[in-house]
Amino acid sequence: MATINMTPGDLELGRDRGRIGKPIEIPLLENFGFDSQLGPFYLGFWNAVAYITGGIFTFIWLMVMFAQVNYNPVAFAKYFVVLQIDPPSSRYGLSFPPLNEGGWWLIATFFLTVSIFAWYMHIYTRAKALGIKPYLAYGFTGAIALYLVIYIIRPVWMGDWSEAPAHGIKALLDWTNNVSVRYGNFYYNPFHMLSIFFLLGSTLLLAMHAGTIWALEKYAAHEEWNEIQAPGTGTERAQLFWRWCMGFNANAYSIHLWAFWFAWLCGITGALGVFFSMPDFVNNWFQWGIEAGINYPQGPTPPVSLP
């Protein structure tokens, strides 16, 4: 039987320390794959800042779009996906424009950024308080890097807020497509290639890990710490299954390392791919692909003869 060495005092956090409410049992949650316990909820300073600033961003975003349809709830629901808050036009550069010409976008982006960093501090400080390593916060930096490059770093580098996407569902998709078209097709962007590789790879790793543990539930393979050291258990069967099918085994620890790095690198390489898509670095990824030898040069159009 495995023993867990716990540093004395790590979990002696007191009765309150920012917790809100008492735990309650909701058995219905178990039908959706969750634990039945709900709460207690920890607020704390950073979490409060994250929720307040995130709420302000959401309020500005929704109300500005609501005003665009003259506060018509039917039209708001109908066109919600295509409504957006546009950034300032290129003539304003990095200056602060009137509210209805991009000012609301700047204000909303400020509160969104504060909310994201406050949430990072919340999960970091909570991990430290529990005596665990803040790897969840470290993983979150991959998403933060991509966000900062798209909304702040790249537009500031180019001296133009209009290079950032609008706040909206369809608007973000349109921005991604437009940047790809302007800079010669993202398919030839090596960082985009890596980002998609890590995106699909992390999805595959998660599916492989989840499928293996789910398949061995009847052997209690989800109790990994005790399972991994005993013969004939679900975990041993999982290791044998991987060796039989793939020739090697990723254990309950290493599979999470693989998944972490794949997911983190998805955001980091995506951020690099977006950042280098500008005239100062790469103006045409298709031409870059030709020069890098991963794409055929464009030849002259063959003559067309009509009968």
From Swiss-Prot:
Q: Which UniProt keywords apply?
A: Bacteriochlorophyll, Cell membrane, Chlorophyll, Chromophore, Electron transport, Iron, Magnesium, Membrane, Metal-binding, Photosynthesis, Reaction center, Transmembrane, Transmembrane helix, Transport
NCBIfam families reported for this sequence: pufM
Q: Which gene encodes it?
A: pufM
Supply one GO CC term from the record.
photosystem II
Q: Which branch of life, at top level?
A: Bacteria
Q: Where in or outside the cell?
A: Cell membrane
InterPro entries cross-referenced by the UniProt entry: Photo_II_D1/D2_sf, Photo_RC_L/M, Photo_RC_L/M_CS, Photo_RC_M
> What name does this protein carry?
Reaction center protein M chain
SUPFAM superfamilies in UniProt: Bacterial photosystem II reaction centre, L and M subunits
Which sites bind Fe cation? 209, 236, 256
Instruction: Give start-end of the signal peptide.
Output: none
- Function field: The reaction center is a membrane-bound complex that mediates the initial photochemical event in the electron transfer process of photosynthesis.
GO biological process annotation, one example: photosynthetic electron transport in photosystem II
Q: How does it assemble?
A: Reaction center is composed of four bacteriochlorophylls, two bacteriopheophytins, two ubiquinones, one iron, and two highly hydrophobic polypeptide chains (designated L and M).
Family membership, please give it.
Answer: Belongs to the reaction center PufL/M/PsbA/D family.
Molecular function GO terms recorded: bacteriochlorophyll binding; electron transporter, transferring electrons within the cyclic electron transport pathway of photosynthesis activity; metal ion binding
What transmembrane ranges does the database entry give?
45-69, 103-123, 133-153, 196-216, 257-277
